[in-house]
Amino acid sequence: MRLVVDANVIFSSIIKDSITRRLILFEDLRLFTPEYFYIELEKHIDLIQEKSKLDRNIVELLIDVIMSNIDVVPLDEYIQFVPEAYKIMKDIDEYDTAFLALAMSLKVDGIWSNDPDLSKQNKIKTYTTRELIKKFNI
C-alpha cells in the first residue's frame, strides 16, 4: 500500500515506541512525505526531544531509522498539484497543502494522518493509524 504520511504521524513515531513506529517500519507500506516535512521537523525538534525524554543523539538516530523507510519527495516533483491542493485545503488547513499535493501527484492509495482536517477533503482517501491497524491486523 502506498501512502503519503503527514508530519504528526512521523513525529509520534519518533516520540514513542508505539504501533505507529511499527507501522512506519511495516514492509507492506511504501511511504512518502514532502520535503516540507524537514522544515516542520526543524521547528519542532526540541519539543519532540522533550516529549520523548530521550537524549538528542537517540532522537537523531530514531529520525534516521524512521526516515530510511519514508521517501522524501522534492517540491519540484509535485509543484504542479499545489494550486489545486491549495484550493481544496485553504479553508480547512492550508498547512496540509503539500501533503495533499504530493498524494495527488503520486496517485497513492491515500494519506496517513490522524489530523481530522485532512479527512475533511474528499480528493484523496485519508487513513488514521487506527484504520491501518485494522486493515493490516496489527
Residue ranges, per PLM feature:
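Acidic, PIN/NYN-like endoribonuclease modules and their adjacent C-terminal/linker elements
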Residues: 104-138
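Alpha-helix capping/helix-boundary segments
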Residues: 10, 37, 99, 117-118
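Active-site neighborhoods of divalent-metal-dependent phosphate/nucleic-acid chemistry enzymes
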Residues: 72-110
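PIN-domain endoribonuclease scaffold, especially VapC-family toxins
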Residues: 26-28, 35-84
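Short, well-structured N-terminal submotif of metal-dependent ribonuclease cores
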Residues: 1-35
